Structures are given as structure tokens and as C-alpha cells.
Amino acid sequence: MNAPLKADDTDLAALMADLATKARAAARVLALAPAEQKNTGLAAMAAALRASAPKLLAANAEDVAEARASGATPAFVDRLALNDARIETMAAGLDVVRGLDDPVGKVTERWTRPNGMTIERVRVPLGVAAVIFESRPNVLADAGALCLKSGNAVILRGGSDSFRSCQAIHACLTQGLREAGLPEAAISLVPTRDRAAVGLLLSGLDGRIDVIVPRGGKSLVARVEAEARVPVFAHLDGNNHVFVDKAASLDMAKTIVLNAKMRRPGICGAAETLLVDKAAAPAQLKPLVGMLIDAGCEVRGDTDVQKADARVTPVTEDDWATEFEAPIIAAKVVGGLDEAIAHIERYGSHHTDAIVTDDATAATRFLNEVDSAIVLHNASTQFADGGEFGFGAEIGIATGKFHARGPVGVEQLTSFKYRVHGTGQTRP
């Protein structure tokens, strides 16, 4: 399962062009594949993942050992690591995707013009997607399943840290495609660790790639957004906030804040800033801060938060705009809803933000005025996930405002075309 760290430039360019050409041909087949055939492939993939769990764990153990030896952070290792539960989650995600309605060919609108022509707006696949991700090997299964269901071919380029894990997972997906009689090039894995492959994908490979989805840290996403010559679905940061309003229940606030920060601190849906209404602070600030610190979270707070618990360290200006991806949270007492919304607008990343309150009017204002892809009322920010939205999985979360926003599932991986039915009409 070893791959060359670097390939000859000419060989790599030829390799990537060949991958893209085959993916393009596979996309033509998938665009016309019946839902039953795609679902057969998804079922076979899920079965292969479950049956191959020992192989997946062995491959992943090598990746994890290598990452630890190179000094990877605990959050990075957590994103990289597989276990039986995570493999089952991957397989179950494929089962959910299989059960989703097929978006391809769905007529979303139909109308008749005064001249008798009937016009239909119909969902169609995007074509070929390139997914560039870093440490999470489960992204490969999620992206492969969603692209297959939506009739798209996909070229996947995982991080070098997860290369062995990705090879093992990809073998399961390829097996499923074979069993369904679908082209293996429908889900391709870049077979080299050479970082130059990323640049070739970003070029669009002479029009063979239709969309790029980066899944990883800020440096990867920033590079993709700066260099890509094709459309990108992405988010740069997950600098997410939880605002505890003056009308919040303390028990609910404690449950939500703890989950939003500490369930998995390294994922993009983790909360990075806690905002507490000044009117709620006397009763709620000390219990919330103490709970987080007792759970192993470092709290960096303003002067009001520091007064609530001697263990709080001073917050810096940079902390407000930081995605920590670790058990660290910035905390601030704000004057009320208006100041909370203003703070989120200034420092947030338009990803996911939540309000905890029993005041329906305050909740409505927050949901309407916070300009993020996902806004929540009385729920944890860690629900920022396609699987939790009922999409089965997600290929990523987009914070842009064109085409796709929020979790990108099968519907967001389609575009549309217009079918016009006439009876001989000509334009006067």
C-alpha cells in the first residue's frame, strides 16, 4: 500500500489527465444510470466496508502510528483515526444515501406558455467533482456515495497522512461499483502522495473537472479558493458561536455549550466562542465556565469572564477570530442580543451559530439576522453535518452564497436544465 512521495512531473501530468478522462467518460454513464443500479452499488459498498473492517483498521493503524511519530496533535489524530464504530457509521451513511430519493431527472418546475409550449426544469448531475481532503478518511466514503447517488463521477485526493486508510476504503467502493456493473472510474483515488497532484486538479485538467470541494484546514481551503480555475464549494473557517440569551434555561445552556465545544473539539461544527448575555451572567456565567474547565476545556475570557472563575486566562483580540480545533474556547459577556449579533458578524466565519433561549422573539431575530449557512435555536452547533440533516452524509459544508450553502448533499450536487416540449411553434 505504499505510494511514491513524488512522481516525475511528466508522468504525474499524464496520470492525472488519464484519471480525469476516464472520470469524464464514467460521468456520462452515471448520468443515465437508473436509480436501482446506483442503489445496488451503494449497498455493495456498505457491505464491503463492514466485511473489510479488519483490513481498514490495520491500514489506519499504520497511518495513525506514522502521524503520532511525526508529532501530530491529538485533534489531528482524532480526525484521522478509525474504529469499529466509525466504520459502521461510514457504512450506515451509505445505507442512508441509498434510501434517499434520486435527484437526477426530478422535475422541479413545469409550466405552459401562452403559445402552448411546456417548459420543465429538471435536475441533472454536475459532471465530475474533485474532492481534496486532508486527514479524515471517512470523507472518501461520504463523497463517493453522494457523487454516485447524484450521478457524478468523483476524483478524490486524500492527505498523505491518510493514504493507506483511503486505499483500503477505496477498494471497498470499487468492489461495490463492480458488483453493480458501473464503471470503476466513477470513484477514483489519486494513487500518489505527490502534492503536485493538487495543483493539477485545481487547474481543472482542461475542462474535465466541473467543481472542486476542499475538506481540510485553512491553508488548504485558502489555496483552493485562490488557485482553482473551476467553481469551488468550501468554507474557510468554522469559527462558530453559542449565544446564551437572558431567557435561556441554565440546564439547557450547560448541555448545549458542553456538547457544542467538547463532543469533538476538532471538527468544523465545534463552537469556538461563547457569548453570554449580561442579564444572564449573574446566574449562568460561573456554572457555564466552571463546567467547561472541569471538562478539560481552556477558557479564554474577557474581564467579566475572568472574574467568574480564577482559572480563566485572558482572551486576546486574535482569539475572537480563531478556529481553535482544540478544547479551547473564547468567552465574552455581551450587552444583549444586538451586541451578540454584531460580534458574530465581525468575527464569525458564516458557518454555524446558535442561540440558547426560551424567548421566541429573540430566537427569530437571531435566526433571521445572523448571516451564517446554518443557524440554530436551542441545539448544538455540532449538528452542522449532512448526516444530521438527513442527507445521509455530506461532501462538505459551503459558506458561499452561490449554488450550494450549508451541508452539500445529493441535491446540491446537481444543477438543472430546461426541457421544452412544443408542437411546431416558431418565434414570430
UniProtKB/Swiss-Prot annotation:
GO molecular function: glutamate-5-semialdehyde dehydrogenase activity; NADP binding
Oxidoreductase recorded as keyword: yes
Keyword Oxidoreductase found: yes
GO BP: any one term: L-proline biosynthetic process
The EC number(s) this enzyme carries: 1.2.1.41
Keywords annotated in UniProt: Amino-acid biosynthesis, Cytoplasm, NADP, Oxidoreductase, Proline biosynthesis
Sections of the chain in a coiled coil: none
Range of residues in the leader sequence: none
GO cellular component, one term: cytoplasm
Localization: Cytoplasm
Reaction(s) this enzyme catalyzes, per UniProt: L-glutamate 5-semialdehyde + phosphate + NADP(+) = L-glutamyl 5-phosphate + NADPH + H(+)
Broad class of where this protein is predominantly found: cytoplasm
Listed pathway(s): Amino-acid biosynthesis; L-proline biosynthesis; L-glutamate 5-semialdehyde from L-glutamate: step 2/2
Gene3D superfamilies (alphabetical): Aldehyde Dehydrogenase, Chain A, domain 1, Aldehyde Dehydrogenase, Chain A, domain 2
Function: Catalyzes the NADPH-dependent reduction of L-glutamate 5-phosphate into L-glutamate 5-semialdehyde and phosphate. The product spontaneously undergoes cyclization to form 1-pyrroline-5-carboxylate.
HAMAP family listed in its UniProt record: ProA
PANTHER family: DELTA-1-PYRROLINE-5-CARBOXYLATE SYNTHASE, GLUTAMATE SEMIALDEHYDE DEHYDROGENASE
Listed NCBIfam families: PRK00197.1 (NF001221), proA (TIGR00407)
Family as reported in the entry's similarity comment: Belongs to the gamma-glutamyl phosphate reductase family.
Protein name (database record): Gamma-glutamyl phosphate reductase
Gene assigned in the entry: proA
